[in-house]
Amino acid sequence: MAVDPRCLLSLCSTISKASSAKGTNDFVKIGMELWQTAQPYLVQALGLQPPPPKVDVDAAVANAGDAHGEQPWVATPLPGQTVRALFIGINYYGTSAALSGCCNDVKQMLATLQKKGLPINEAVILVDEDNFPGRTDQPTRDNIVRYMAWLVKDAKPGDVLFFHYSGHGTQCKSRGDSDEKYDQCIAPVDFQKSGCIVDDDIHKLLFSRLPEKVRLTAVFDCCHSGSIMDLPFTYVCSGGEQASGTPHMKRIREGNDVLGDVMMISGCADEQTSADVKNTATFGTGSTGAGGAATQCITCMLMNNQSLSYGKLLIETRDMLKRKRFKQVPQLSASKAIDLDQTFSLTEMFSVDRSVQ
């Protein structure tokens, strides 16, 4: 599918008067201003990290008791439903691991969700860019753990949750609590002092208390992110990773079932790195400047297509990266065997393919 950059530019630049209010930030406008901030985005692999300390999930839940977010924009609410979102972008300023585009990724995702009218009641923004509009706090290990627990705190059937991470992803030797040789990790801004956060702990923080009929969408734009949420089902294609053969969902692990309806799109497979974009205007997302390739593709797909199926969203994201000569292959995993012909939605529960056990 050819993406017309003018289409998305028009969408981003046409701002509804009802989309912002006094005391809120207009992220669509901010996303447009990225046209003026072009700079290189250099990705460095962190290499194998030492196993970090385990996260005390009960303590994290207690610590999240008084945490709260802010309403980022005004939109028509979902009756009887709460919509929460957690955005994390880390550039690691002043360190040997420095990146340039991860905070821009958060701006681009916020702009996309605002333009689509997702009625977020509470948003938390953890970024290490001091002048980032609406920033909640620094993306330290303690803060990320606390606000992951906050995201799902008191969630009830019908609620809608959204999670976006852009930063370093890496691996560490497994702590021995799984059959895998390596754990996938995300790297907080203070990872060199406090350690990373492994996939096992991400799974427990987000899913151990998640009830049925809660919808959670997650985007991880980082290296080694294919199975970073340890979800039981993944998208597979009979024609291979890059092909568009017969797609279906497949169970890949037992014992990690999740009650809620959770879907994750990752920037790449576990063994891959998630590439950079030096000039994001080449993706037609209405912005330039540094940014993650997967974030730019996903936001472009969401803004240019109103009725993509789950399967088409992933295939066209992969195809766009392939056309731009990136080698990474985004992955889709879920808590249930999604009917891949179902129209993609950030708020609706899944239709399940009952043929997949």
Curated annotation (Swiss-Prot):
Keyword Transport: no
Pfam assignment, any one: Peptidase_C14
Gene Ontology annotations for the cellular component aspect, listed alphabetically: recycling endosome
GO biological process, one term: proteolysis
EC number: 3.4.22.-
Matches recorded under SUPFAM superfamilies: Caspase-like
Listed GO MF terms: cysteine-type endopeptidase activity; metal ion binding
Summary of activators and inhibitors of this protein: Activated by Ca(2+).
Top-level taxon of origin: Eukaryota
Residues annotated as site: Cleavage: 22-23
Subcellular location field: Recycling endosome
Residues binding Ca(2+): 183, 199-200, 230
Main subcellular location: other
Consequence of gene disruption: RNAi-mediated knockdown causes no defect in the growth of the bloodstream stage form. Simultaneous RNAi-mediated knockdown of MCA2, MCA3 and MCA5 in the bloodstream stage form causes a growth arrest resulting from a block prior to cytokinesis; DNA replication and mitosis are normal. Has no effect on VSG protein recycling. Triple knockout of MCA2, MCA3 and MCA5 in the bloodstream form causes an initial slower growth rate in vitro which reaches wild-type levels after several weeks of culture. Triple knockouts have a normal growth rate and virulence in infected mice.
Membrane found in the keyword field: no
Keywords assigned: Autocatalytic cleavage, Calcium, Endosome, Hydrolase, Metal-binding, Protease, Thiol protease, Zymogen
Catalytic residues of the enzyme: 168, 223
PANTHER family associated with the record: METACASPASE-1, METACASPASE-4
Function: Cysteine protease that cleaves specifically after arginine or lysine residues. In the bloodstream form, may cleave inactive metacaspase-4 MCA4 prior to MCA4 secretion.
Family of this protein: Belongs to the peptidase C14B family.
Name the UniProt record assigns to this protein: Metacaspase-3
Organism taxonomic ancestry: Eukaryota, Discoba, Euglenozoa, Kinetoplastea, Metakinetoplastina
